[in-house]
Amino acid sequence: MKKNILVVDDSALMRRVMCDIINSDSKFQATDYCRDGLEAYEKLKHTSYDGVVLDVNMPRMDGLQLLEKLQKEGIRANVVMVSTLTDSREADVTILAMERGAIDFVAKPTNIIEAKGEAFKRQLLGVLNAVLATQKAAESVRPAVKPAAKAPMMRKATGGKNKLVALACSTGGPKALQSVIPFLPKELDAPVVLVQHMPPGFTKSMADRLDDLSKIRVKEAEHGERLQKGCVYIAPGGKHLKVAKTADGNNSIVLDDATPAIGGLKPCANLMYDSLTGSSYDEIVCVCLLYTSPS
């Protein structure tokens, strides 16, 4: 049976393009469309969809306002945001949307040529396939993330080991990170390097928001900076992140612009993990994080 998708966008052209893309996959069917969040709210009150593709900026009720209303009223939805890369405000709103229940997002094309191109088609179908594969249909929208009132106590490690945590996230990663990073203790006895597969512009917004929510420091990684304990370094979108041993035996961040995307990903987690073999760390914990609904 095909998965029923609701498309919400104020542009008639974008609605048609996204519906055509969705219908081109035999697993999906663009069952309904709406011009704004208010129309979508009325539909979602009475109809369950397997997925919702939701624009950010719309008249009457925008995407974030719709998510807040769904959350408040406990209306079920699996939401993928569509957000403009060139608008820094939309990047911030998209990160907030993850707290309001959105599972992931895709970058909105800037013109009709891009909208009808293969890259956007692959991106939209790829995210829908991944999201619906890891989600129960019509998962309840979750409460907003709140900082931990008290971080769990950390036991002091013995032996003076030099440790590193390396995190990788893909589909649903931003949502999953909001359930993990805010609960890391400020005194974590290791730096954390993190690759989230996101386009440029969004990683800075995500780092800033996670820093606001967390006791541990969170920042977008910078080329050449030395890794410090108790800090999370997020790879910037559009750049590969590597860890390199310095001449004095410490470790620093290397941001790689030159290497092409690997499997369509830049940053690519595999490249980060490969670089760790040349670092000076005694213990490295590697984690791949994916958001899934509870059983």
Across the structure, where does each feature detected by a protein language model lie?
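Residue immediately C-terminal to the conserved phosphorylatable aspartate in receiver
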Residues: 44, 51, 56-57, 70
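Conserved acid/base catalytic micro-environments in cytosolic active-site loops
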Residues: 2-6, 12-23, 33, 38-39, ...
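Acidic, metal-coordinating helix/loop segments flanking the phosphotransfer/catalytic sites
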Residues: 33-51
